[in-house]
Design a protein with these regions (language model features):
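Ligand-binding beta-strand-loop-alpha-helix segment within the catalytic cores
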Residues: 1-20
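General beta-strand structural signal in soluble alpha/beta enzymes
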Residues: 3-4, 21-26, 32, 54-56, ...
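Active-site glycine-rich loop that binds ribose-phosphate moieties when present
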Residues: 4-7, 35-48, 52-74, 111-116
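Short coil/turn connectors at secondary-structure junctions
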Residues: 16-20, 24-27, 34-35, 41-42, ...
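Anionic-ligand binding region
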Residues: 92-123
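Eukaryotic N-terminal low-complexity, Ser/Thr- and Lys/Arg-rich leader segments
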Residues: 209-221
């Protein structure tokens, strides 16, 4: 027997265990047609109420990314994307691709900057979570037109076959693997590895900040 937890479930467990940062693959979100079906991942509501920083490769590209970002804003969740060498307003990543067509609400340059944001939120006692989007390494990213065509086909087939609710995501992911071949598998491994490295570096920088803060002498009033 094997299994895993959702981002929402992992956030709850992390908060109980005192873990401030964790890395994952891709965030759940608002499904296409979610304005009618109300099919919205619990990942989003948990980000609105549980103070844990999540590092992910954005959200899966077959979701409604625009509505997902709007939902996170409503929940009061910070969403920031690592610039990863880019300048200006950059896209929120969409799992297999570095761009999504939707601009990131904010941009973070370094792991140290992300750690400072996490610490500031903790000091202010703001209880919502934080999402730091880490774009897939450029050499492993899938071409946006290719993956969009595969997504459209997989989502259409899921609708035609009645795969809704909890059955939708597994079907779409499985179909995308068939349509893209080994490219999606290789991209999955690359983005998870990149997220783990990024998350570990953020956690290390946060630990350094916490240590330096605790060693500072108390100020007299």
């Amino acid at each position: 027997m094997h299994g895993g937890t959702t981002i929402a479930g992992t956030m709850v467990l992390a908060r109980l265990a005192g873990i401030r940062v964790f890395a994952t693959g891709g965030l759940g979100g608002v499904h296409r047609g979610g304005e009618n079906s109300m099919d919205v991942s619990a990942d989003l509501t948990e980000l609105g109420r549980t103070r844990v920083a999540v590092v992910s490769a954005g959200c899966k590209g077959f979701l409604d990314i625009g509505r997902t970002l709007e939902f996170l804003e409503t929940q009061g969740c910070l969403v920031s994307t690592f610039a990863d060498g880019r300048t200006g307003n950059i896209d929120f990543p969409a799992f297999w691709t570095r761009g999504s067509g939707f601009k990131s609400p904010s941009v973070v340059q370094t792991e140290k900057e992300a750690a400072a944001i996490i610490l500031a939120q903790e000091k202010l006692n703001i209880e919502s979570g934080m999402l730091f989007a880490n774009p897939i390494p450029e050499e492993f990213a899938l071409p946006l037109p290719d993956i969009q065509a595969a997504i459209e086909q997989a989502v259409r087939e899921a609708d035609e076959k009645g795969f809704t609710g909890s059955k939708n995501t597994p079907y779409v992911l499985g179909r995308l693997k068939e349509l893209t071949g080994d490219r999606a598998y290789v991209a999955n491994k690359a983005l998870v590895t990149a997220n783990l490295i990024r998350g570990a570096n953020v956690a290390k920088e946060l630990s350094n900040l916490l240590s330096s803060t605790s060693q500072q002498p108390a100020k007299s009033l």
